[in-house]
Amino acid sequence: MKSWVIGNWKLNPTSLEQVQHLVTDLVEGVDAQTRSMDNCHLMLAPSFLHLSPVQQALNANSSTLKLAAQDVSALSAESGAYTGDVSAKQLKDMGVQWVIVGHSERRQYYKESNAVLLKKLLNSAEQGLGVILCIGESESDFEAGHTEQVLDEELQVIADFLQQLKPEQAGYAEQNLIIAYEPVWAIGTGKVPSVEQVTQIHRFIRQQLHSFDNKLDTTPVIYGGSVKPENAADFAASDQINGVLVGGAALQADSFLAIAKCFNN
């Protein structure tokens, strides 16, 4: 199974000029350093505003970098009177291939529930977009030993999603789903769980996916939370960690590519 290294730019950079410099550095870095990166998929998730210029830069350079959006509308897969939303169809038309759903920041600030996330999953599937579903526990839940309980509740959206897929969408989930385990207490804090802890949690996630449908046994399960070049090799050494969702380190081309190299080995 190929690894996935996904850069979530969040609300960065602040100017188009900075975006253009970053994507240029990434494309040139991939061309110069990682042409032989056969074991790793690379993906960028810029803000909605910067999807178009990033896609144009990738197309102009025939880059193998994939493009993801950081969110997608739950209200419509196509169009409608939903001010501020961006639909799966609009994203697909822009060249987006994947969407991030359920990031802890959206769960926290926008109070996104499993019911909302289910709609986003279904809308993405309707347009053939892949989904990176983020799950993770708070520090208090982690310290109380409630990690598995929280993850089980958050993963239930996958069970509901599978039940609501249309017959013609059979096979969608096993080809277009990535689970990103991001402990909330590790995101941007510098606190990092041990590789052993993440490995054990990923095994639990796989068990839950298998209980929903054994065809999900090959679903990539990746880790996110203060991933840096300094710790990437440790995570890459675990056979249960199929890649990483990178935040701050994705805003520097050298750092992002250094992480990618760890997962190409």
UniProtKB/Swiss-Prot annotation:
Subunit organization: Homodimer.
Active site (UniProt): H103 (electrophile), E182 (proton acceptor)
Enzyme class: isomerase
Molecular-function GO terms, alphabetical: triose-phosphate isomerase activity
Biological processes annotated in GO: gluconeogenesis; glyceraldehyde-3-phosphate biosynthetic process; glycerol catabolic process; glycolytic process
InterPro entries on file: Aldolase_TIM (IPR013785), TIM_sf (IPR035990), TrioseP_Isoase_bac/euk (IPR022896), Triosephosphate_isomerase (IPR000652), Triosephosphate_isomerase_AS (IPR020861)
EC number(s) stated in the UniProt entry for this protein: 5.3.1.1
Organism encoding this protein: Psychrobacter sp. (strain PRwf-1)
Keyword set, alphabetical order: Cytoplasm, Gluconeogenesis, Glycolysis, Isomerase
Protein purpose: Involved in the gluconeogenesis. Catalyzes stereospecifically the conversion of dihydroxyacetone phosphate (DHAP) to D-glyceraldehyde-3-phosphate (G3P).
Binding site for substrate: N8, W9, K10, G188, S226, G247, G248
Localization of this protein: Cytoplasm
A Pfam family: TIM
Protein name: Triosephosphate isomerase
Pathway as given in its UniProt record: Carbohydrate biosynthesis; gluconeogenesis; Carbohydrate degradation; glycolysis; D-glyceraldehyde 3-phosphate from glycerone phosphate: step 1/1
Gene behind the chain: tpiA
Catalysis performed (reactions): D-glyceraldehyde 3-phosphate = dihydroxyacetone phosphate
Similarity remark: Belongs to the triosephosphate isomerase family.
Recorded GO CC terms: cytosol
Annotated PANTHER family: TRIOSEPHOSPHATE ISOMERASE
